[in-house]
């Protein structure tokens, strides 16, 4: 993304409009050595690795950005394309009937349902919109519905490029101007 903006003579200024915190919910059961662990976002991966020993799992991630959020040297058994609509169908072919632990946020869309035979979801963390000091900008790139809410709460009014249809829907719902949608 940065290369695209640089090529057009534009600058990117980043500011996350969400806060992630542990939910304090216990693990619903006892993970077995070599169970799969699916990490669905960079924030989830970083938080999970800070609180748990990830070496006991075979790790699957939503995409490359999530994999990169884990500590250096963490073995990743499978990395998805980053497209939530496809990832769980693809992952189901890899894990078969193995247990897959899914630490998820309070606002998850539960896209694994209907794909994974032995999904072990648990509400591991909360995502909350937060107010930030926005830099001067012409367009906002918003990566999630929660980020859209945080952007608006921060006084954002610029046209928005939303990552994914769910985010685009939230952008329209809260009255921001949708300039486009990226996959």
Question: How should these model regions be labeled?
Answer:
Residues 1-183:
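Signature of uroporphyrinogen-III synthase
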